[in-house]
Amino acid sequence: MTMLNTLENLVELQKETVKKALKRRDDAKAKIDESKKSIFEFAKAVHDVKEGDMDTLFTVLDFRIDDYANAVKWLAIEERTLERYTERLLQEKTNG
């Protein structure tokens, strides 16, 4: 084997090493891009779930507000009924 053959072999080995390194670099870039996409999708999913939870929370809150509003309405009705009942009792007492 001549020195030239040895150098040619070394150059070929270096080319292969560079090709492998470039492939690993490209694979790493692809993995990074894939990871970024995965993180984004996960963050979006978490956001959606959180948003869904918030929607559920607001739905429950709306029901609670409706329940409260109905309770206030019925309290007002009962208070008016009691006022009328009391007025009627007072009228009957003064008339009778």
Q: Which residues fall in each region the model found?
A:
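Short intrinsically disordered terminal tails
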Residues: 1-5, 9, 89-96
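Short, charge/polar-rich alpha-helical segments
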Residues: 2-33, 69
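Alpha-helical interaction segments
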Residues: 15, 32, 58, 74-75
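Amphipathic alpha-helical coiled-coil segments
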Residues: 21-25, 60-92
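Extended alpha-helical coiled-coil "stalk/arm" regions
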Residues: 28-57
